[in-house]
A protein has these predicted regions:
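Generic structural signal for well-ordered, non-transmembrane alpha-helical segments
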Residues: 82-85, 118-125, 157, 161-168, ...
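Charged/polar positions within long, soluble alpha-helices
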Residues: 89, 93-96, 129-132, 136, ...
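Glycine-rich beta->alpha junctions and the first turn(s) of the following alpha-helix
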Residues: 31-125
Length: 227
C-alpha cells in the first residue's frame, strides 16, 4: 500500500539505487537530443533503504541554492538560449556569404533576410533578458531568506515556457531564412532545430506549465512542489 501524504495523495519519492540493479531499455530514438540517452528503465524486487530516498520538498542543506526545492529546474533555461545563440552565429555566417539565385545578389542585402535576422536576434535577446530578470528576482528573494511568493513562482514557471518556445521559434525562422543549407544532414542549424523541437516536449515547455503559471498568478498552488 502506498504511504499517503498530508493531502491524502500517495507520497512521491525519488530512490537512489546502483545502475546494476536497474534494467535500461533502449527507447531513446528521437528527433533531437539524441546524445542525451534518456532511455526508460525498470526496477523490480529491489529493496531501497529509507536513507537512499528523498522527496523534492524535503530541504537537506542550508544556503540560498537549496532554499527552494524547484531551483534545480532553472538550469533548463540556459539550454535553449545556448542552442539559439549558436544558431544565430551559424545563420549569420551562412547568410553573409550566400548569393541568392536567380537574382545573383548577396543574401545580406535582401530586405527579407535582414528583417528575419533582426527579428531572430530580438526574439532570443528578449527571451534571455526575461530569463535573467525573472531568475535574478527569484534569487534575490531566496537570498533574503524568504520563500518565493505565488507571483514569483508564477513568473518563473511562465519564463520556462516562454524561453523554450521563443528560442525554438527563432531557430525555425533562421532555418527558413537560410534555406536548403539549413536542412542538410550535418548542418548545425538542422541539429539546432531538431534539438529545440525535442526540448519543446519537456514538461517545462508545455501548455500545461503555462496553465499552472496562470493558476499561481491567481494564488492557486501547482500540483508539483517544484513549480
Amino acid at each position: 500500500m502506498p504511504r499517503l501524504g498530508p493531502g491524502g495523495q500517495p507520497e512521491w519519492r525519488i530512490a537512489l539505487v546502483p545502475a546494476s540493479q536497474a534494467e535500461v531499455h533502449d527507447t531513446w530514438h528521437t528527433t533531437g537530443l539524441c546524445g542525451t540517452g534518456s532511455n526508460d528503465y525498470s526496477i523490480d524486487g529491489v529493496l531501497v533503504q529509507p536513507g537512499h530516498t528523498f522527496a523534492l520538498d524535503e530541504l537537506q542543506r542550508e544556503g540560498t541554492l537549496y532554499r527552494w526545492p524547484g531551483f534545480f529546474i532553472t538550469n533548463s533555461l540556459g539550454i535553449p538560449l545556448g542552442v539559439a545563440a549558436d544558431a544565430l552565429d551559424t545563420a549569420m555566417g551562412i547568410l553573409d556569404r550566400k548569393i541568392l539565385m536567380p537574382e545573383r545578389t548577396p543574401a545580406r542585402d535582401e530586405a527579407r533576410v535582414r528583417a528575419a535576422i533582426a527579428r531572430a536576434h530580438a526574439m532570443v535577446g528578449s527571451a534571455r533578458s526575461y530569463a535573467y530578470d525573472t531568475l535574478g528576482g527569484f534569487w534575490s528573494v531566496l537570498e533574503s531568506g524568504d520563500q518565493p511568493s505565488f507571483a514569483a513562482r508564477a513568473a518563473l514557471a511562465g519564463c520556462y515556457v516562454h524561453t523554450m518556445t521563443t528560442c525554438r521559434d527563432a531557430v525555425q525562422l533562421l532555418v527558413e531564412t537560410v534555406g536548403t543549407a539549413a536542412i542538410q544532414r550535418g548542418s548545425s542549424l538542422e541539429r539546432n532545430l531538431r534539438d529545440l523541437i525535442t526540448m519543446g516536449q519537456h514538461l517545462v515547455a508545455q501548455v500545461k506549465m503555462r496553465e499552472w503559471a496562470g493558476g499561481l498568478w491567481f494564488g492557486q498552488p501547482a500540483p508539483l512542489p517544484v513549480i
